[in-house]
Amino acid sequence: MDEFRVDVPWGVVRIEAIGSSLGIPEIDPLESPAEGNRECVVVAVVHGDIGPVDISVSLQDGEDEGTCVYDDVLRVLGEGVEVADLVGDDFSHRYDLPEGDASVRVCVDDPGEAQRVLIRIVAKA
């Protein structure tokens, strides 16, 4: 499991297939803590001005921690997946995954003001 603590500008964490052309989904944190399309997921977290966010990324199945706010499939395009801030300027972590579908499950400590995020990205066989 990869774990890191970051200040998240704009209060949005992006999980995206590298090379995606679908664009980043719009998110309104007051309406929903997470939104996604076939190649990208965004998750609302506390803004960097308020405090840091602890992010854990696992490429294996396991138990949830907190509240699950997203559970769907992401199309990986062959170059892996990036977990980053909204534009990728402040932090960016890349994970090798095979081309094809991967399940993505995101759990947070508080859907309204997440300060801990667990992201599970598991390639489907």
Predicted regions and their residues:
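Short, solvent-exposed coil/turn segments at beta-strand boundaries
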Residues: 36-39, 79, 99
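Extended, solvent-exposed segments with strong compositional bias
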Residues: 64-91
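Surface loops and adjacent helix of pleckstrin homology
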Residues: 86, 107-109
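A glycine-anchored, Pro-Gly-centered beta-turn/N-cap motif
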Residues: 98-107
